[in-house]
């Protein structure tokens, strides 16, 4: 299997990611909110500026060779509690179900523990997103609870 790398997201990589983006209906609990994605250069710039200026967040491009295939964030980084949350989104169906997300999540957990000094990483998925739940469990996250919309997971050092 080809090797995945996490690279600090740049504005250029962010545009490359979203030029080929497809919204995934499986991550929408309320289908009234689902709309096909249409690339908008100004919107991507605003997104990158907003996320990139957040000191409690690390934004990564998921790289397959020199091609960006997804985005991963370590967010809500709390150095006092030594916890953060993981968020991942793959670009489109062509890169899903191939183990790339699993590799990326493993790298992110290693980064959180080894580089950021975190003791725990949290994650959540909407209840119907069984694919994401399976990947989290495969990486070592444990089910921590649920509510009407989300299932919550946690991995500790």
Locations of regions flagged by a protein language model:
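Short amphipathic alpha-helical patches
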Residues: 40-45, 51, 71, 135, ...
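A short hydrophobic/aromatic micro-motif that marks alpha-helical segments and, especially, helix-coil
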Residues: 38-40, 55, 155
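Acyl-donor (CoA/ACP) binding surface of acyl/acetyltransferases
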Residues: 1-16, 20-26, 59-157
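Short, flexible, glycine/charge-rich loop motifs used to bind or transfer phosphoryl groups or to couple energy/partner
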Residues: 49-50, 111
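Short loop/turn motifs at secondary-structure junctions and domain boundaries
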Residues: 50-56
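Conserved GNAT-fold acetyl-CoA-binding loop/helix
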Residues: 26-47
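Residue-level detector of secondary-structure transition/capping positions
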Residues: 25, 35-36, 52, 144
